[in-house]
């Protein structure tokens, strides 16, 4: 529904939207001799929840799923013309909502002098910090993939960029809003009340067909990397009040957000900051995350590098009127290991500590290639000392270990 209780104008079903965009992207470019590259991976994931579920209906034990993520890329005219088509699919044996298909990218991109043009579906990343990307607002989070908000849905867009000595300027027209997916009734990592996507409310008479706009200026100034961004459109975060039927109903507010990302590089230090100011969720508010990464290179005369990370979070939103967040007053600490060996072995460990109630979130991520075509990945996430008032309280029994075996081609 829209905010004025009128039936929403729904954007076409996701698969149809993606198909039409991909068809347009491929058919809009004449046949030009160039380079075609086909790559990607298939994988099997085993996700184990060691604790019994907190809510009725949730599965327990192991979730087995299969991932298919091919990439089709075409380049011509020395790379000035590019076409990409990257679909993604997951088939889950335990949660029907986690079985899903998406087109991550399907676009035509053309460079003409200092200008770049892109039409289609794409993923755009903004940000510099490790533990949270406040300014990264173009794409919707694929929340059923993982809890770290790193996985993103493809976003239909028109992107025009200009590269000059004084920096880069990008403008985005974003037609068609992507709603955030949520776990189903049998799934883990959900609230007690399941989410009713069919009743989603949009603060726009156009419903999820609202056209959003965004822009970003970025530049290198000495040892500084600077990014300034502006976004106006439907929030990628949803408020989740309980509806008349006892289920949570997503509310997507119309917001305006200004963002700043900074990175300062000096010797072994990386100093990082992301900050936003947003209006549209009740009172305007600001939020920031900032910290550092210090790297010890070639530890003990080996090829390995070790990085130490620390970041402080603050978020001034009023959660009575804004989407909930667990990063209101938190400290992140972590360490990164890169062996720099032929198998590209690396690991990241970290914790996020709530400085107000003591809730601790721990994680470990590691990966290593096996030969030329295989890779094994491990991920573990644990909640410790969870306060019942914390936003993460519904997930207190959802600590998990995920193992992936992937074959690349």
Language-model segment annotations:
Residues 44-52, 82-93, 104, 141, ...:
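Transmembrane beta-strand segments that form the barrel wall of outer-membrane beta-barrel proteins
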Residues 58-66, 99-104, 152-156, 163, ...:
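Residues that define the transmembrane beta-barrel architecture of outer-membrane proteins
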Residues 36, 72-76, 109-112, 121, ...:
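Residue-level signature of outer-membrane beta-barrel architecture
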Residues 268-354:
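Detector for outer-membrane/organellar transmembrane beta-barrel domains
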Residues 40-42, 83-85, 119, 160, ...:
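Membrane-embedded beta-strand positions of outer-membrane beta-barrel proteins
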Residues 36, 78-83, 115-117, 166-169, ...:
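Repeated loop/turn-to-beta-strand initiation elements of outer-membrane beta-barrel proteins
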Residues 292, 395-409:
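Outer-membrane beta-barrel "beta-signal"
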Residues 72-189, 222, 385:
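Outer membrane beta-barrel
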């Amino acid at each position: 529904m829209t905010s004025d209780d009128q039936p929403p104008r729904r954007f076409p079903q996701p698969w149809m939207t993606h198909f039409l965009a991909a068809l347009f992207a491929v058919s809009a470019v004449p046949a030009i001799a160039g380079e075609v590259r086909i790559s990607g991976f298939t994988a099997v994931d085993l996700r184990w929840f060691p604790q019994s579920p907190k809510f009725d209906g949730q599965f327990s034990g192991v979730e087995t799923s299969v991932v298919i993520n091919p990439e089709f890329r075409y380049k011509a005219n020395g790379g000035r013309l590019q076409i990409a088509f990257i679909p993604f699919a997951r088939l889950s044996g335990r949660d029907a909502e986690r079985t899903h298909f998406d087109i991550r990218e399907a676009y035509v991109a053309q460079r003409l002098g200092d200008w770049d043009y892109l039409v289609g579906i794409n993923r755009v990343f903004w940000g510099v910090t490790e533990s949270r990307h406040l300014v990264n607002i173009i794409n919707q989070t694929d929340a059923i993939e993982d809890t770290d908000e790193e996985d993103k849905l493809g976003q239909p867009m028109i992107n025009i960029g200009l590269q000059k000595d004084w920096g880069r300027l990008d403008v985005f027209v974003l037609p068609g809003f992507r709603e955030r997916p949520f776990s189903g009734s049998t799934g883990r990592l959900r609230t007690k009340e399941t989410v009713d996507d069919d009743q989603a409310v949009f603060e726009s008479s156009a419903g999820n067909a609202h056209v959003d706009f965004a822009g970003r200026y970025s530049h290198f100034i000495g040892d500084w990397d600077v990014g300034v961004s502006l976004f106006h459109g439907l929030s990628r975060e949803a408020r989740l009040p309980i509806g008349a039927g006892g289920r949570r109903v997503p509310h997507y507010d119309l917001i305006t957000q200004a963002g700043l990302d900074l990175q300062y590089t000096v010797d072994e230090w990386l100093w990082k900051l992301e900050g936003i100011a947003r209006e549209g969720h009740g009172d305007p508010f600001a939020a920031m995350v900032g910290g550092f990464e210090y790297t010890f290179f070639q530890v003990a005369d080996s090829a390995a590098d070790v990085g130490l990370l620390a970041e402080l979070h603050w978020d001034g939103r009023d959660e009575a009127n804004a989407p909930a967040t667990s990063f209101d007053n938190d400290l992140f600490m972590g360490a990164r290991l890169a062996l720099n060996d032929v198998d590209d072995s690396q690991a990241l460990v970290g914790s996020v500590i709530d400085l107000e109630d003591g809730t601790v979130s721990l994680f470990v991520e590691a990966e290593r290639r096996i030969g030329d075509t295989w890779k094994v990945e491990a991920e573990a996430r644990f909640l410790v000392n969870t306060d019942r008032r914390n936003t993460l309280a519904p997930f207190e029994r959802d600590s998990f270990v995920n193992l992936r075996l992937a074959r690349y081609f």
